[in-house]
Amino acid sequence: MTLTNLDVIVVGAGFSGILAVYRLRKLGFRVQGFERQERLGGVWRENAYPGAAVDSLFPFYQFYDAELLQDWEWVEQFPTRAEMLRYFDHVDKRWEISASFEFGVSVSAARYSETTQRWTVSLEDGRRAEARWFIPAVGFSSVLNIPRIPGMSRFRGPIYHTAKWPHDAVSMRGKRVAVIGTGPSGVQIIQSVGKIAKAMTIFQQSPCLTLRKYGSPSQTATALCMRPDDHREALRLGLQTSNGFGYVPRDQDTLDVPIEERNHFYQQRYLAGGWAFWMAGFRDLCQNIQANRDAYDFWARRTRARISDVAKRELLVPQIPSFAFGIKRPCLEEDLYEVMDQPHVKVIDISNQQIELITETGIRVHGQTVECEAIILATGFGDEASGLRSLHIRGRNGIRLEDAWSDGVESHLGMAIHSFPNMVILYGPQCPTLLVNSPAVITVQVEWLCEIIARCQQAGICQLEATSKSHCQWERKMSLLWDKTLYHTHARKSKKTAEANKEEKTWVGGLILYRRELENCLANNLEGFQAWHVEETGLL
């Protein structure tokens, strides 16, 4: 069976997929969405681990649509998974978006036909769907990063990945628990499970640089975040600040400010909680290594004072940082270091000597076995392109996406790829995923997507494809910004990019400049694209 009466196919029902379906449907396009989960919510539907919560304040992490505010009120300043699912249910009630999705079905392949100028999407249940446009909206949190550790199948107890946590109740109370990974989910797991476990052993690859969710125990708000009481104003601000969270950096370089004034400023930002210390700090935080070290030293002094165990203090908050502060998105914590400082919690450094194997009863490292009853993999997801690769996409002449990206990711605007006509990626590689509020990025991308598809329909364009030249131009624009920052000092390299001596760069110019690039493309007659009209192809 093949569904053929479609204009657009959208894969994924997280923020980007939901918004794309809603906006395109409002424009009158025939849209069909597919989602492997049973309901809306994307990563929030899957991430059921203890402590799962949003790491940004409530006015900004939502759809930028004032209509949704009419009968909705956020209860939590940093919404938990439960509140996020309640929010998606509210969105569904308002927008009736589930009517345009099929749930519980996975996409096994997607292929473009030059003969018909249409995409065919194959589903795992054997059905197919065809449409002019194909919109993968799977983000970069859809493919799990499972470490390859010998002996995993031998372990007698349960092994949980945070993104595949059982939705049924799982109790860690009174158990000996091992946690591998100290990224965002690791931080939340450690805070939640560490308080009730009999023993917890944390395997740390590198120290996790965190910021206090609340600047002090008595605080419940971030005073220095531009967070107006009027949520509509907050939504406007979210699209008019570079980070999408309303934070504005101080318009001074760090070392131009006297040390006493500097430390007073750091103290203000630190006590504000949230990401104020990072996003509302001095403007050269992630550009000047001396400025960056100055900020790190202040943070380290405050954080080290919370850890009484000397050995743990050096592991968790070293005096010399492993990487520049803020080039990785800081995790937010409430009492992480107090939990890790407890005697029943052990921290093992695996930066130089990896885990050897998993036995029936524990984890062997440094020649010794750590006994445990449950293992938690807080190891996150694959690289930003892993979700797209999992869809087995083939473009013009049957070229596989994996082959097109054999030397690393290439794109135009982080949304389109040469040899893959009529395919627009939402919230994928090479767009502002690192430093910007994701719903804000998605909002401007979907606005651009809708304008592109509407223009093509009006102009009789049946095929729109990014040029190979546009890849080079986008790479050059990214590099001009990237090379001025400290991000290149700790750039991640996949095996393929390492072989090609390329860094996995992303857009670090923020939301305002990115939106300008999208607008320039539209204003300059779809710059960077080649278009074929219906009369040129013979398709009527």
From Swiss-Prot:
Cite the position(s) of the site with description Transition state stabilizer.
Answer: 329
Keyword Plastid on this protein? Answer: no
Cofactor dependency: FAD
Recall the GO molecular function terms of this protein's record. flavin adenine dinucleotide binding; N,N-dimethylaniline monooxygenase activity; NADP binding
Q: What is its EC number?
A: 1.14.13.-
Q: A Pfam family name for this chain?
A: FMO-like
Entry's SUPFAM superfamilies? FAD/NAD(P)-binding domain
Q: Which keywords does the record carry? A: Alkaloid metabolism, FAD, Flavoprotein, Monooxygenase, NADP, Oxidoreductase
Q: What class of enzyme is it?
A: oxidoreductase
Q: In which pathway does it act?
A: Alkaloid biosynthesis
Which residues are listed for NADP(+) binding in this entry? 53-55, 182-188, 205-206
* Conditions for induction: Expression is induced in loline alkaloid-producing cultures as well as in planta.
Quote the biotech use from the record.
Loline alkaloids show broad-spectrum anti-insect activity, and different lolines may have different biological activities. In vitro tests of NFL, NAL, NML, and semisynthetic loline derivatives with long carbon-chain acylations on the 1-amine have shown that many are effective against both fall armyworm larvae and European corn borer larvae, but the effects seem to differ depending on the modifications. N-Formylloline reduces the weight gain of fall armyworms by deterring feeding, and does not significantly affect corn borers.
Which biological process terms from the Gene Ontology are attached to this UniProt entry? alkaloid metabolic process
Where FAD binds, per the record, is at 43-46, 55-58
Cofactor remark from the record: Binds 1 FAD per subunit.
Role noted for this protein: FAD-binding monooxygenase; part of the gene cluster that mediates the biosynthesis of loline alkaloids, potent insecticidal agents composed of a pyrrolizidine ring system and an uncommon ether bridge linking carbons 2 and 7. Lolines are structurally differentiated by the various modifications of the L-amino group and include norloline, loline, N-methylloline, N-acetylloline, N-acetylnorloline, and N-formylloline.
Q: Which family does it belong to?
A: Belongs to the FAD-binding monooxygenase family.
Name of the protein in question:
FAD-binding monooxygenase lolF1
